[in-house]
Amino acid sequence: MQVIQDIHEQVEKASSGFRLSVENLLQVGFNIFRKAPAEFMVFSVFGLLVFSNPISGLLLGGPVSASYFHMAHRVKQGARIEAGDYFKGFEKFGELIKLNLLIFVVVLLGLALLIVPGVYFAVSYTFSHFFVWFFQMEATEAIRLSRKTVSGNFGQVFLLFLILGAINFLGVLALGIGVLITMPLSFCVVYAAFDDIIEISN
């Protein structure tokens, strides 16, 4: 109960306003990636297969994202990435699928009405997977807490969103192979952002 209370207090504090240094987050994310580049790149072969297909991305994207964040957290804590960590996110398969489906429906409805609401929801739910994976929240509570957290400085999170999108676009241009670097790097940067706003305990 104490952990749940603490995370709600952290979210409440974040919603009142926070500042992010995009340059610092890119550096922190890169430092995490460079400590285990081979492990991240190997997992990204599977990640690419999942995210390159809309259906598999919708159904498996949640657990894959959680696995990336889990690995980034282990590296930051000074631990080695082991084979079992690659699919750790699948331990919460059901809740993460539910989360992805909820996000998909809400963002799709937003895009159907106007593009702006869809983009708003997509950015607002950036941190949803963290609340499910690290804090055992249900999907509906996770998207609520993510939106509330991002509301503390939507502009900077959106800017980070754009920069990571540009980085991955460059990865695609590099014969597609570059994505094996830019995709895990992006997950490490998003992890760094969330950890900066809502500190993840051991």
Named regions from a protein language model:
Residues 20-49, 83-109, 123-172, 202:
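Interfacial aromatic "cap" segments that immediately flank transmembrane helices
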